[in-house]
Amino acid sequence: MPKTQTLEQTKLSEPKMYKVILLNDDVTTMDFVIEILMNIFHQNLEKASQTMLEIHHNGSGICGIYTQEIALSKQKKVMDAAKLANFPLQAKVEEE
């Protein structure tokens, strides 16, 4: 008698996505924010300038949307770079 094999189907769901948000402050320079957006979030100069102005005018701005692990990694990179440059720039991660 031939062996039969049952294949189990597993439904994969999309991972939860998280927004990385930069918060405006009165000390961090616009140039530094643009540098962060280009180096950590890989935005080109035009997009980085637009995002920086959104942060400046609205108090915060979304820099990107990622899986949780990547979002937290980018948040840490922002915080580390800001600390190294003696800026109080803050980043937060929120579920989308």
UniProtKB/Swiss-Prot annotation:
Binds to the N-terminal domain of the chaperone ClpA. Belongs to the ClpS family. PANTHER family: ATP-DEPENDENT CLP PROTEASE ADAPTER PROTEIN CLPS (PTHR33473:SF19), ATP-DEPENDENT CLP PROTEASE ADAPTER PROTEIN CLPS1, CHLOROPLASTIC (PTHR33473). It comes from the Bacteria. Gene3D superfamilies: 3.30.1390.10. Involved in the modulation of the specificity of the ClpAP-mediated ATP-dependent protein degradation. This is ATP-dependent Clp protease adapter protein ClpS. HAMAP family: ClpS. Pfam families: ClpS. GO terms for biological process: protein catabolic process; proteolysis.
